Amino acid sequence: MSRPRRRGRDVHGVLLLDKPQGASSNDVLQKVKRIYNANRAGHTGALDPLATGMLPICLGEATKFSQYLLDSDKRYRVIAKLGQRTDTSDADGQVVEERPLTFSDEQLAAALDSFRGETQQVPSMYSALKYQGKKLYEYARQGIEVPREARPITVYELLFIRREGDELELEIHCSKGTYIRTIIDDLGEKLGCGAHVIFLRRLAVSKYPVERMVTLEQLQALVDEAAAQDIPAAQLLDPLLMPMDSPASDYPLVNIPETSAVYFKNGNPVRQSGAPLNGLVRVMESESGKFLGMGEIDDEGRVAPRRLVVEYPA
């Protein structure tokens, strides 16, 4: 019995969406999916409704590799309001405490420096992490606080941009799993005044080019232009997509010949000279340049398939 065909197009790749403020990541994901008429879509780590900026959206087979972007570095621009603490650590929450600003410039510099490098961070209750199968923010909305373990994070760079009155602007380059709201809340406590996020923009994810970001309005304009020209919208939309292997671009590339690719695609490990000694790799067919999927070097030094691209008929 053949499986039912998915609704929508077999379109594969990654769209770098510039998420608007006030919208949830899932809302914009569904809009992009509809605009592209894609049969599958998924994002690579949610942005808060308050936040704007780069939200990579994976379409089709690219959704299989979105997990690798979750492990990538991110860069943010954030503006904090000093002197007020909120229950969500951002401007969408309720003010729970107000305190005067009494710290010196030297104390601010020392506090900022304490966040640089490898540290431990206790996630906010207003996060999508799960405790006993339920998201933390669901507990928080019921007024329930549950235990959270501190997690290792790395802040590679923390730049002081400006301070004007009770506003502090920073740029932060950080590792996966870093909550900017929590950094700002913790900073406010170190300064003794409290703080919360009033502006947050994700500037970059991994090595994706910032200039390839597009807005929902730009996508809709292309749809309208295609209709006016009486051509398929895909003709204008699809060139915006990054390659489906781009979420895993940080991993080494292994090219295998067509003869080996047949075995690899059928789930069998293959030998390839020049492959790394261990770890995950991206696997391409050398003759066609076609991305085959992710492999891992096994104990015998072979490239074993771990996640494969399945080609759907057009």
From Swiss-Prot:
<comment type="function">
    <text>Responsible for synthesis of pseudouridine from uracil-55 in the psi GC loop of transfer RNAs.</text>
</comment>
<dbReference type="GO" id="GO:0031119">
    <property type="term" value="P:tRNA pseudouridine synthesis"/>
</dbReference>
<dbReference type="InterPro" id="IPR014780">
    <property type="entry name" value="tRNA_psdUridine_synth_TruB"/>
</dbReference>
<feature type="binding site">
    <location>
        <position position="43"/>
    </location>
    <ligand>
        <name>substrate</name>
    </ligand>
</feature>
<comment type="similarity">
    <text>Belongs to the pseudouridine synthase TruB family. Type 1 subfamily.</text>
</comment>
<dbReference type="GO" id="GO:0160148">
    <property type="term" value="F:tRNA pseudouridine(55) synthase activity"/>
</dbReference>
<dbReference type="GO" id="GO:0003723">
    <property type="term" value="F:RNA binding"/>
</dbReference>
<dbReference type="InterPro" id="IPR015240">
    <property type="entry name" value="tRNA_sdUridine_synth_fam1_C"/>
</dbReference>
<dbReference type="Pfam" id="PF09157">
    <property type="entry name" value="TruB-C_2"/>
</dbReference>
<feature type="binding site">
    <location>
        <position position="179"/>
    </location>
    <ligand>
        <name>substrate</name>
    </ligand>
</feature>
<dbReference type="Pfam" id="PF01509">
    <property type="entry name" value="TruB_N"/>
</dbReference>
<dbReference type="InterPro" id="IPR036974">
    <property type="entry name" value="PUA_sf"/>
</dbReference>
<dbReference type="InterPro" id="IPR002501">
    <property type="entry name" value="PsdUridine_synth_N"/>
</dbReference>
<dbReference type="InterPro" id="IPR032819">
    <property type="entry name" value="TruB_C"/>
</dbReference>
<dbReference type="GO" id="GO:1990481">
    <property type="term" value="P:mRNA pseudouridine synthesis"/>
</dbReference>
<dbReference type="InterPro" id="IPR015947">
    <property type="entry name" value="PUA-like_sf"/>
</dbReference>
<dbReference type="InterPro" id="IPR020103">
    <property type="entry name" value="PsdUridine_synth_cat_dom_sf"/>
</dbReference>
<protein>
    <recommendedName>
        <fullName>tRNA pseudouridine synthase B</fullName>
        <ecNumber>5.4.99.25</ecNumber>
    </recommendedName>
</protein>
<feature type="active site" description="Nucleophile">
    <location>
        <position position="48"/>
    </location>
</feature>
<keyword id="KW-0413">Isomerase</keyword>
<keyword id="KW-0819">tRNA processing</keyword>
<dbReference type="Pfam" id="PF16198">
    <property type="entry name" value="TruB_C_2"/>
</dbReference>
<feature type="binding site">
    <location>
        <position position="76"/>
    </location>
    <ligand>
        <name>substrate</name>
    </ligand>
</feature>
<feature type="binding site">
    <location>
        <position position="200"/>
    </location>
    <ligand>
        <name>substrate</name>
    </ligand>
</feature>
